[in-house]
Amino acid sequence: MSKETLVSTCNTESATGYVWSLYFYKIDRRSKEQPYKFYKVRFKNEDYLMSYAKSLMSCVNQFQIGPIESVQEYDGENTKVSCDKLVTDNELVAAQLTTFVTALGKASDEKVKGKIHGYVLFGVSQTDASKTITFIKSANPITSLTNKKAVVFTTTADDELEMFSDSVCRLYLNTDIVIIDKIMYTFNHNFEALFDIEKTMAKVKTAAIDQMLATTSFADPATFKTYASQYTSNRTFITLKEERLNRVRDKRKRKVVAAMLKIELDESGEFIIDSKEKAAHLIKYLCYKIFKDGETNDVLEASTINTLTI
């Protein structure tokens, strides 16, 4: 979905075409099977929720979607001028998102006790029940106006000041995540903690290293595996692609890659990986984090666009 389509979906006019519900959620990672707990929020006046939905969609459109330059596939390196997207069955989020949605479907009517970790505004199309839109905000909406920095009073019927100590609910006019049908759009990396994808990233890293080893392009596979396993950024491995794996499978193209990265080859034409640095450079290359500038021949790191000294 392009930015233009995202703009046309999130706007004040579209809000009236949905039936809206609001839910608070809590997270308890000690419960491994179902860490999420949802609570249905009810309003004294039903018009309040529609009013909030309109305001939220208007502000998201103007202040979050408007400034971005593009919508891109999630690669763990948001440039701050783009919106990331993932299909909801992406292995990074699929399992936890399913658990999240399952918990939402079993929302409780009980009064919330303890700290709230966030809330969900869920809309179902009035003309097509299969068409939905979901806004997720990872922030506690319940706050106290009286705190260490301020004391708050309210005016009584007798025009006197009385200390106001009750908690209030503050719903933000921005969002961390928008899910439209089967695509999840993220404006920051808060979803990584929400869906606990660090564990999933670790599995992606392990699978990626196995794919690299399967190219049979290493003089000492065990040494490369050791160095690769010590590579600290799991998110780098998200962008591993078959095209670059195929390059190092091909002995002729492997020589070009080795020359670019200053990695030696043995007599059989296999990579000699004898340091963490060389392993890191090859990993970054295979995961599209390193490329060669066609004009200057400088070797650049994609996430920072800094020339590497290798």
Feature locations, PLM:
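Short intrinsically disordered terminal tails
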Residues: M1, T307-I310
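Acidic, low-complexity, intrinsically disordered interaction modules
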Residues: E33-A302
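Charged, amphipathic alpha-helical stretches
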Residues: S2-M57
